């Protein structure tokens, strides 16, 4: 396949352009030199007046048509709208808040013009009609508002006028109304005199409120936008079906890039909560391939081009049919099941891609790590290299945003920041973030995740092959193209596997926020919006938090584990929805809270009217339900009742699509319920109340301790009284709590068989709940272990009653371990958990002191473990272990000159490759290595390239690998000998190999397993 490249002529200095397709503004294009000479690297800069161009099936076409539309409008049906006012039914997936000013009056129907004088909020509802046409409905008349408590003698009108009269203040229409409201901050049943300040545009809210605060006023709900007012005040939703009874078609002065557009008032809308089906929303999975002139590509280097972009489309709810496209820089041979669009330069391809997002009716985009790489790279190339105005490529015109916000603070933990994709009218789902959140794997490469979830693999093309393939011509580019397309196909399959688009839409509906904010804006905004709605129903208003420097609190603690191997049944009981149930049972809320210093202000309250908790900061009180019902409790009760009803429907449902939606609905409720506690405990959150959060964790700790004492005191006779069937047991039967983890207790059941424990577990949990706790707090039997290796807090391995292996906090497939260590460690673990003789020996050892083995020797059963270690050493010594199983790999994360520490194994191998004049790895390549030769004081010097090792028959470092194995095994059986270092000593003492090597003797620990 070939085409005429208008930007490369015979003479490099000849920049003449064909007469057809010209524009007034010159465009600077970067064209790869290899298009002229396949062996030449780099780019040539060509200035041209030609409009962006593409080739499809050998025919040249313009990216943009004369009517301003793009090439993609030719490839979808045109939807015609009637000219007169009409009734329409449509589904929305996004709401965009914009502001119109009075100079836009001629663009809109006369009846809405007063809503934008001097300016006004316009909400753009984006979605699809019943017929499948994309639609934008511009909603007028929705006002934003907040509340103000004015100090005595203050004049609210004067203060607002003063704020608006200041220089650079935006013009704004406003209205004040005296109202009575309860304030949600502490127990206070009284209604207060406040002013409701309604403004025509949200642009003025902060300007006015800041001025009011500086004049001694107290403001409320200034952090609520017009979208949430629209949804909450009208009982609407951010995702679902609407009917507009009086929609005015907008034929001219269009303000969106949809098939059709209408104007209406918010009062013309009706929401259909009972309809859950989806229209055929267009989901696009994409991936980019780049080349770097000097290693890993950097978007701001002119020569580091994007060479291909794959786009895979799927209509939500359709069968597995997808449509594959490949945008290629330069000629490209055919790729199976893929439409190939060829572009003569990178800027042409970028115009093709961004116009595709805008004009191909794409509602959802997805990819793998697109928020950290693909989209930032695309945006930087477009804006920094070519000065493309990307705000022209979202789904709306006014208020358009097309950017990725990368926070400066990207730390870990609860408040960790993530890059946020912000494209107006586009829901962006980064499947890398989704997979990291939902899976627990040794790494989160697309290949690893796809293999784990859907049993699929990527095409085998390494990064270092991409440049040679690209330069080689159409066939090479087709190979890259297939690799690129398959990546997008895999991501689309992962999206379908998790059905994450349905999940986030259900969270958005429950939390009353736009769907595109679910993945990026955290849980604070979800709970805040729900609390806002609940507060409004009870005439409460919410204060604005400014307590950013408040101290934190002691989080959930555990009952320290008793490490060891347990060859008895271990019952795990846990509290169902622990934190939500504590809030419900103890009536905890802002509205029920009385600080200790304020208790004297409520002389009418008796001690029986409130519950007192002793926190680290002092006593705190919460009134009981008969005095004031907790708003948080009521919210949780409604949610949990709804979840119960949904799960009942789910059990009866047979339609797969409906089952998926119901499942995601109940999951959305579960996630949001569990977020309520965290919402109150974040000092820098939207409405923090550390006293509530600390009370919840205090109660959680107290409940664990109470349960421990109660269960351990339970005798076989007591158990028999509460169980309707005969409970068989040994004479010495007893219960011992060996670990408590936040909301779970691990109970060793001495003298009871596993089957017996499984049968009485529910009765024991229910009896404990009944005797100790108020409803709805409920202890449940979660699982039973046949045997358990309890290593430390949140680290254990066991065999469940159904014979399945369960591991928590223990990763046998470690990134820093080779397959030899992983496989042998797994073999030994399997022996300890399943071989009766080894199990008995392990149980004995875990009850003895660490030096028992040195005094008395190892039990006979445990010698099977030593036999495996001896056999492994023999295999290493005799060369029976394949080099592939001994290979490590580490990413070359940056140029070698940027490393401060050079004694790293992969850098040693890099230098050896350079010395041998072989092709060096590129930045972000993984460098494989093995350890060879005799042990030295600097382990990194022993690293060698695996291929070179095999070719030259270099002996591996037997003792180093065996030591890694010893440490790997010690890591998983350390509880038998009290700690890892003692376990290493015991193992070395009993293997038939002399102690020739140990990490403790060396100073270089850079590659420790």
UniProtKB/Swiss-Prot annotation:
Cross-referenced Gene3D superfamilies, in alphabetical order? DNA polymerase family B, C-terminal domain, DNA Polymerase, chain B, domain 1, Helix hairpin bin, Palm domain of DNA polymerase, Ribonuclease H-like superfamily/Ribonuclease H
The listed locations are: Host nucleus
Pfam family of this protein, just one? DNA_pol_B
Q: Which UniProt keywords apply?
A: DNA replication, DNA-binding, DNA-directed DNA polymerase, Host nucleus, Nucleotidyltransferase, Transferase, Viral DNA replication
Q: Which reaction does it catalyse?
A: DNA(n) + a 2'-deoxyribonucleoside 5'-triphosphate = DNA(n+1) + diphosphate
Q: Which GO terms describe its cellular component?
A: host cell nucleus
Offer an example of a GO molecular function term for this protein: nucleotide binding
- Would you kindly state one Gene Ontology biological process term found in this protein's UniProt entry? DNA-templated DNA replication
EC number(s)?
A: 2.7.7.7
Q: Which SUPFAM superfamilies match?
A: DNA/RNA polymerases, Ribonuclease H-like
EC category name:
transferase
DNA-binding: is it a keyword of this entry? yes
| Annotated signal sequence range | none
**Matches recorded under SMART domains:** POLBc
* DNA-binding as UniProt keyword: yes
Coarsely, its chief localization is: host cell
Which superkingdom, per the lineage? Viruses
Q: What family is reported? A: Belongs to the DNA polymerase type-B family.
Spell out the protein name for this chain: DNA polymerase catalytic subunit
Organism whose genome encodes this protein: Saimiriine herpesvirus 2 (strain 11)
């Amino acid at each position: 396949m070939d085409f005429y490249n208008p930007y490369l002529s015979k003479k490099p200095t000849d920049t003449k352009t064909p007469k057809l397709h010209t524009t007034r503004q010159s465009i600077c294009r970067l064209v790869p030199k290899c298009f002229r000479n396949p062996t030449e690297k780099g780019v040539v800069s060509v200035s041209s007046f030609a409009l962006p161009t593409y080739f499809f099936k050998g025919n040249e076409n313009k990216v943009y048509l004369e009517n301003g539309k793009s090439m993609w409008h030719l490839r979808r049906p045109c939807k015609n709208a009637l000219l007169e006012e009409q009734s329409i039914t449509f589904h929305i997936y996004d709401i965009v808040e914009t502001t119109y000013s009075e100079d836009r009056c001629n663009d809109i129907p006369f009846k809405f013009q007063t809503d934008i004088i001097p300016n006004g909020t316009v909400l753009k509802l984006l979605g699809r009609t019943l017929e499948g046409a994309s639609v934008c409905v511009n909603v007028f008349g929705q006002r934003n508002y907040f509340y103000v408590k004015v100090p005595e003698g203050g004049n609210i009108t004067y203060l607002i006028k003063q704020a608006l009269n200041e220089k650079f203040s935006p013009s704004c229409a406003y209205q004040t109304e005296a109202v009575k409201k309860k304030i949600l901050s502490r127990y206070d049943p009284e209604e207060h005199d406040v002013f409701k300040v309604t403004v025509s545009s949200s642009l003025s809210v902060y300007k006015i409120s800041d001025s009011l605060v500086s004049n001694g006023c107290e403001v409320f709900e200034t952090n609520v936008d017009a979208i949430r007012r629209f949804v909450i005040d009208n009982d609407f939703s951010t995702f679902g079906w609407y009917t507009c009874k009086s929609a005015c078609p907008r034929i001219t002065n269009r303000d969106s890039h949809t098939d059709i557009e209408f104007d209406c008032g918010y009062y013309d809308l009706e929401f259909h909560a009972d309809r859950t089906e989806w229209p055929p929303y267009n989901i696009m999975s994409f991936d980019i391939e780049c080349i770097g002139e000097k290693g890993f590509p950097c978007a701001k280097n002119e020569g580091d081009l994007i060479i291909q972009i794959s786009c895979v489309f799927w209509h939500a709810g359709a069968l597995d049919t997808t449509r594959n496209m490949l945008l290629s820089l330069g000629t490209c041979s055919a790729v199976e099941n893929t439409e190939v669009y060829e572009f003569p330069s990178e800027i042409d391809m970028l115009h093709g891609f961004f116009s595709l997002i805008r004009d191909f009716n794409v509602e959802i985009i997805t990819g793998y790590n697109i928020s950290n790489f693909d989209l930032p790279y695309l945006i930087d190339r477009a804006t920094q290299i070519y000065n493309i105005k990307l705000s022209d490529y979202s789904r709306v015109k006014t208020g358009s945003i097309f950017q990725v916000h990368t926070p400066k603070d990207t730390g870990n933990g609860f408040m960790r920041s993530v890059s946020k994709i912000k494209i107006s009218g586009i829901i962006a789902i980064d499947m890398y973030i989704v997979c990291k959140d939902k899976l627990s794997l040794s790494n989160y490469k697309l290949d690893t995740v796809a293999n784990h979830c859907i049993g699929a693999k990527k095409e085998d093309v390494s990064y270092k092959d991409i440049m040679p393939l690209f330069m080689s011509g159409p066939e090479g580019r087709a190979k890259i193209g297939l690799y690129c397309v398959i990546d997008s196909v895999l991501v689309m399959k992962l999206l379908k596997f998790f059905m994450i688009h349905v999940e986030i839409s259900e969270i958005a509906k429950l939390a009353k926020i736009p769907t595109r904010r679910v993945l990026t804006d955290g849980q604070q905004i979800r709970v805040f919006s729900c609390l806002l709605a609940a507060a409004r129903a009870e005439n409460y208003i919410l204060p604005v938090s400014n307590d950013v420097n408040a101290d934190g609190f002691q989080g959930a603690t555990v009952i320290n584990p008793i490490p060891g191997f347990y060859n008895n049944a271990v019952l795990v009981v846990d509290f169902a929805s622990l934190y939500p149930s504590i809030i419900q049972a103890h009536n905890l809320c802002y509205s029920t809270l009385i600080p200790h210093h304020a208790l004297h202000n409520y002389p009418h309250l008796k001690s029986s009217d409130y519950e007192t908790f002793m926190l680290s900061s002092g006593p705190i009180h919460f009134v009981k339900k008969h005095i004031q019902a907790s708003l948080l409790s009521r919210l949780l009760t409604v949610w949990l009742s709804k979840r119960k009803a949904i799960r009942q429907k789910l059990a009866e449902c047979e339609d797969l699509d409906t089952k998926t939606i119901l499942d995601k609905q109940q999951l959305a409720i579960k996630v949001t319920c569990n977020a309520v506690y965290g919402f109150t405990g974040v000092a820098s959150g939207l409405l923090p109340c550390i006293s509530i959060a600390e009370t919840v964790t205090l109660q959680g700790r107290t409940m664990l301790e109470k349960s421990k004492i109660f269960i351990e005191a339970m005798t076989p006779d007591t158990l028999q009284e509460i169980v309707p069937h005969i409970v068989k047991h040994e004479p010495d039967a007893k219960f011992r709590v060996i670990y408590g983890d936040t909301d779970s207790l691990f109970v060793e059941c001495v003298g009871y068989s596993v089957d017996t424990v499984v049968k009485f577990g529910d009765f024991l949990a229910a009896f404990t709940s009944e005797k100790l706790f108020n409803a709805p707090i409920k202890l449940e039997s979660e699982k039973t272990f046949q045997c358990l290796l309890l290593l430390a807090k949140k680290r254990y391995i066991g065999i469940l009653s159904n014979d399945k292996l369960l591991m928590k906090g223990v990763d046998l497939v470690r990134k820093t371990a080779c397959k030899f260590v992983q496989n042998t460690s797994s073999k030994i673990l399997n022996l300890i958990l399943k071989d009766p003789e080894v199990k008995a020996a392990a149980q004995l050892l875990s009850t003895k002191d660490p030096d028992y083995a040195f005094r008395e020797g190892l039990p006979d059963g445990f010698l099977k473990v030593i036999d495996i270690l001896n056999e492994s050493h023999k295999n290493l010594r005799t060369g029976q272990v394949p080099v592939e199983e001994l290979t490590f790999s580490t990413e070359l994360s940056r140029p070698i000159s940027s490393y401060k520490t050079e004694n790293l194994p992969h850098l040693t191998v890099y230098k050896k490759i350079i010395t041998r004049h072989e092709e060096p790895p590129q930045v972000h390549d993984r460098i494989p290595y093995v350890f060879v030769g005799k042990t030295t004081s600097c382990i990194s010097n022993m690293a060698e390239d695996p291929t070179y090792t095999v070719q030259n028959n270099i002996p591996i470092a037997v003792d180093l690998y065996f030591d890694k194995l010893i440490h790997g095994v010690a890591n998983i059986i350390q509880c038998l000998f009290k700690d890892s270092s003692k376990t290493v000593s015991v193992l070395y003492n009993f293997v038939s190999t002399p102690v020739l090597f140990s990490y403790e003797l060396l100073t270089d620990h850079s590659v420790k397993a």
